[in-house]
């Protein structure tokens, strides 16, 4: 894919990073839906930046102010939400769990960021999955190839990350039903196949493995994600929670196996 074919926001992020980070950049990568089966109506644009040093507070502030201007809200195709992650390479070589992230911009943090609270460094199990995904399936926008900067990640580290992330995901179900169901689908798919895929493809795979009472619910989540219908969960809350519990048990069983 030619860089001119990317959404305008991708080139804007590259420009912002080059201006603010200057000589710190080792590589910039596009990953996620954009590099798999294409961006869906509610998809973020996922970008990983690997640097050769930690970020100062002034750099965090400058990055955040600029990204707030170009990142859009969920469902806005013309101005998509951005998820921009910055990692200092020395924090992941050698690999540690949970990995350290220098900075993450995401629309769920907009209120805090607009109030002047800029993303800080943190250790996050989900970063292991992000790194695995970027190493396996990303487009290099600038610098070295991802496999040159991200060490090989054993699959047991992915299982560990899923194990750590599962309780928090389940607890966020109320009000985020579609995303939780689709993320559980992707966890299940990944644990069986040792591959990563988009949420709708994972859901299609999981639907074939569900007891007959559950496929309509997951189909609703999948079709809403694809923009084919509007999903409403209040009237099926009990059944949807039962589906979550069923999927959780399948995932936990897979996590127990070596």
UniProtKB/Swiss-Prot annotation:
The alphabetized UniProt keywords are: Antibiotic resistance, Plasmid, Transferase
Q: Which domain of life is it from?
A: Bacteria
GO-annotated biological processes: response to antibiotic
**What disulfide bonds does the UniProt entry report for this chain?**
none
The protein's matches in Pfam families, at most eight in alphabetical order, are given as: AadA_C, Polbeta
Q: Which regions form coiled coils?
A: none
Q: Please name the NCBIfam families in this protein's record.
A: ANT_9 (NF012212), PRK13746.1 (NF010309)
Q: What is this protein's name? A: Spectinomycin 9-adenylyltransferase
Its UniProt entry gives the catalysed reaction(s) as: spectinomycin + ATP = 9-O-adenylylspectinomycin + diphosphate
* GO MF annotation list: adenylyltransferase activity
Purpose of the protein: Mediates bacterial resistance to spectinomycin, is probably a spectinomycin 9-adenylyltransferase.
Which species does the entry assign this protein to?
Campylobacter jejuni
The knockout outcome noted for this protein's gene is:
Loss of spectinomycin resistance.
Looking up InterPro entries in the UniProt record yields: AadA/Aad9, AadA_C, NT_sf, Polbeta
Matching Gene3D superfamilies, A to Z?
Beta Polymerase, domain 2 (3.30.460.10)
């Amino acid at each position: 894919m030619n860089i001119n074919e990317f959404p305008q926001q991708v080139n804007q992020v590259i420009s912002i990073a080059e201006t603010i980070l200057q000589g710190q950049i080792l590589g910039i990568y596009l990953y996620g839906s954009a590099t798999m089966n294409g961006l869906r109506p509610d998809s973020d644009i996922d970008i990983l930046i690997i640097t050769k040093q930690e970020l100062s507070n002034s750099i965090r502030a400058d990055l955040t102010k600029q990204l707030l201007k170009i990142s859009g809200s969920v469902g806005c195709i013309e101005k998509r939400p951005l998820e921009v992650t910055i990692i200092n390479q020395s924090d992941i070589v050698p690999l540690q769990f949970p990995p350290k992230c220098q900075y993450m911009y995401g629309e769920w943090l907009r209120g805090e960021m607009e109030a002047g609270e800029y993303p800080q460094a943190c250790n996050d199990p989900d970063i292991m999955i992000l790194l695995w995904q970027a190493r396996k399936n990303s487009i290099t926008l600038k610098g070295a190839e991802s496999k040159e900067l991200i060490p090989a990640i054993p699959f047991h580290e992915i299982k560990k990350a899923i194990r750590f992330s599962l309780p928090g995901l389940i607890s966020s179900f109320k009000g985020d039903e579609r995303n939780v169901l689709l993320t559980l689908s992707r966890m299940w798919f990944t644990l069986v196949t040792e591959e990563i895929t988009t949420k709708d493809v994972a859901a299609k795979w999981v639907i074939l493995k569900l007891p007959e009472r559950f496929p309509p619910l997951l189909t609703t989540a999948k079709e809403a994600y694809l923009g084919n219908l509007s999903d409403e969960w209040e009237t099926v809350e009990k059944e949807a929670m039962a589906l979550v519990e069923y999927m959780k048990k399948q995932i936990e069983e897979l996590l127990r196996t070596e």
